[in-house]
Amino acid sequence: NWKDTFSSADSTRRQYDYATSLHSSQVYTPQLIVNGKHVVSAGSPEKLLKVISDASAAPALPVAVDAALVGGRLVVNTGGGSGEANLILAIFDESETVKVERGENGGKQLTYHNAVTGLRTIGMWKGKALEVELPRKEYLTEKGQGCAVLLQRITQQGTPGEIIGAAVVSGTGS
């Protein structure tokens, strides 16, 4: 079998945590989680498009999140609301082409967009407006990287829950 270029122990652990949260008996790759609430196989493009379309048509996420580069810092601001959530920074490669050695895509070159290469909790949100500043060079080290900031509830089991706010900053790498 071909090894997934973007796999990591952390990603696998997160997939199993989502399986617990979403009461799913399956973990597979590639797997997409939409807004922390819906699990979809990338092998089901029609279903994926429907889930994304439905999520896009739903009311906006309830908590405003803004992220911007200011000088050498990434500055994140959230609005207020109710409950608690983790503030998570997701680092991604905006575009990466990989030659697949084996498997159903063996011999092909596939281009991935926005493949997450790192996740880190950067704060705890307690329902009040929050500002977090991070040194850009500590998190965004390579050209072609971007980041997303997710405000994500945690379930009673301690697993990832619903995303209640989000922001994206593209083209942020060195």
Where are these regions (language model features)?
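Short, conserved sequence motifs used for protein processing/export or organelle targeting and
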Residues: W2-T29, K37-S174
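Ligand-binding face of N-terminal immunoglobulin V-set domains in extracellular IgSF glycoproteins
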Residues: L32
